Design a protein with these regions (language model features):
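Extracellular glycan-associated modules
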Residues: 1-147
Length: 147
């Protein structure tokens, strides 16, 4: 559950490290959309449609799901409890972290053992699961936050 101080200049909410394999949920300020980017051997991204003008400090519940079954699986992006994008991952995907030492929320685990690309906003809730969530589970998480 996130908000940006300024959606025009918020930056990414990366987790892990793109260089060695990782995932990122990112706000794309040029066209105002969210993207879920699992970098799992090959680049695969899933994007919401452009959201138009976004008022400052608008909160979003953003969930990225990769079912972990390689190129036979699916990458999904949910926004406020609803699926907004889905695609098959690029061929050859596998989760690899050969050189990574850190896992970062709100920045990228940089090569110099320090976080970089810091997110400019607030992250109220961040969760990581050891399995792919179903659409029903994502909706329940959103409904629970809204209560």
């Amino acid at each position: 559950y996130v908000t940006a101080k300024d959606y025009g200049e918020s930056g990414p909410i990366p987790m892990g490290c793109h260089g060695g394999g990782g995932v990122a949920i990112t706000w794309q300020d040029k066209d105002n959309y969210w993207t879920f980017e699992p970098y799992i051997g090959n680049y695969s991204a899933c994007n919401t449609p452009p959201l138009g003008e976004v008022p400052e400090e608008t909160w979003y519940h953003v969930v990225g799901v990769w079912d972990g079954t390689g190129s036979a699986g699916a990458i999904k992006l949910y926004l406020d409890g609803e699926i907004k994008a889905e695609r098959a991952p690029a061929k050859g995907n596998s989760f690899q972290f050969p050189g990574n030492k850190w896992f970062v929320i709100g920045g990228d685990a940089g090569a110099a053992n320090e976080a970089d690309r810091a997110y400019k906003g607030q992250i109220a809730v961040a969760r990581i699961y050891d399995r792919a969530l179903t659409a029903e589970e994502v909706k329940l998480l959103y409904d629970t936050l809204e209560e």
